[in-house]
Regions:
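Short, surface-exposed, charge-dense and proline/glycine-enriched linear segments
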Residues: 8-24, 159, 216-227, 301-308, ...
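A generic secondary-structure signal for well-formed alpha-helical elements
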Residues: 6-10, 180-187, 262-267, 271, ...
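Non-catalytic DNA-recognition/assembly elements of restriction-modification systems
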Residues: 52, 171, 286, 290-358
């Protein structure tokens, strides 16, 4: 609703300043609605004034002097049962031809209808078409966990066009025929894109091919940021992760240190959407923070690299055998806390970003 005010015709009369922009503070309302009515609900709510941080598309720094322009979301490899597989041993007396493996769809309890009720995809595939894939569930702070395995129509760092998949290899052609048939028969009626368009939506798969030696990945959502570096350019990144290229090992460790600092999560929470258990989506909000480009001559940057190395050592030596990824992250963070690394990361990141220490 807009209220207008008629201006004075006397141009010589000083006019009050017109209200514009957004207020400096906001009122944060939290609590649960009471079934007893609004009066009881009002008593159950808390009202907390908080500084207002407005989201804006305006940028003070160009993509050449910040990391935000290089951040990319992973590929849409869903529905997962069409792509992710487990390798199986052969039952043939003659064994499997060299370079070929039996596969079966990898299934999880998190699958949704109608895909969870469909039978597995099974068959034989050339091993060169099976790729390691990292998802949100394969990343812990400062440590990449065991990647999943997926069949993808990629050959020599090139995503095969749909018409070329049929002629590239007979085993790949059979898998693609089976996968696309399932997709077309079971996709949502409002979904018009092909399976090929799905996996390369907005170029998120092709953008990864021919990747640099060092990349940093971080969780797209959650209550705490989890980031790790990858050093295998052939590994593929799924859409529950965002990734950013690094020029060298030290820059990758620098970024991992900044992203994994608890203070970073706390600061980014101001921008996040919120769910029942708190802030949830990180997306690219973290890059609204004034994170400077890595400079090896800066002592503070070197300190963050050293802290990342210590954190990687601690995370790598932590026993995570058999743990679900949520618990694995919790155990790694507890080890970093116990070693005093989180506190040192917070101190360094507060200095880097000009923030009050947590």
């Amino acid at each position: 609703m807009i209220f207008g005010q008629r201006g004075s015709r006397d141009l010589g009369t000083e006019q009050p300043e017109i209200a514009h922009g957004t207020p400096a503070t906001k009122m944060v309302v939290s609590g649960l609605r009471s079934q007893s009515g609004w009066e009881a609900t009002n008593k159950a709510l808390t009202f907390t004034p908080s500084p207002l941080k407005a989201l804006t598309a305006d940028r003070e720094e160009s993509d050449e002097t910040s990391y935000r322009g290089g951040v990319t979301q992973g590929a849409n490899l869903v529905p997962r049962m069409l792509f992710f597989v487990k390798e199986e041993g052969t039952t043939s007396r003659l064994g499997m031809s060299s370079g070929r493996v039996n596969y079966r769809s990898m299934r999880t309890p998190q699958e949704k209808s109608p895909w969870k009720s469909l039978p597995d995809l099974t068959g034989v595939i050339e091993r060169r078409f099976i790729y390691d894939v990292h998802l949100g569930s394969t990343i812990a702070p400062f440590r990449a966990l065991q990647p999943w395995r997926a069949i993808l129509p990629i050959n020599r760092d090139r995503l095969l066009e749909e018409e070329h998949i049929e002629t590239a290899d007979s085993t790949l052609a059979q898998w693609w025929h089976d996968a696309t048939s399932r997709w077309e028969q079971n996709r949502n009626v409002t979904t018009k894109i092909s399976l090929w368009q799905q996996i390369n939506y907005q170029g998120k798969l092709t953008h990864q091919l021919g990747a640099p030696a060092h990349r940093v990945v971080y969780s797209a959502s959650g209550t705490s940021l989890a980031a790790a570096r990858l050093n295998d350019p052939r590994q593929v990144i799924e859409h529950k992760l965002y990734w950013i290229p690094a020029r060298n090992l030290q820059e990758a460790q620098y970024l991992s240190a900044v992203l994994n600092a608890p203070l970073t999560t706390k600061t980014v929470a101001e921008y996040q959407s919120r769910g029942l258990f708190g802030a949830r989506d990180f997306d690219t909000y973290v890059w609204r923070l004034p994170i400077p480009i890595y400079d090896s001559e800066q002592e503070l940057h070197q300190r963050l690299v050293a802290l990342a190395q210590r954190a990687e050592d601690v995370a790598g030596q932590t026993d995570l055998e058999g743990m679900a990824f949520q618990k694995a992250r919790k155990v790694v963070r507890a080890a970093l806390d116990a070693g005093g690394i989180h506190a040192k990361l917070n101190d360094a990141v507060a200095e880097l970003l000009g923030l009050p220490e947590s």
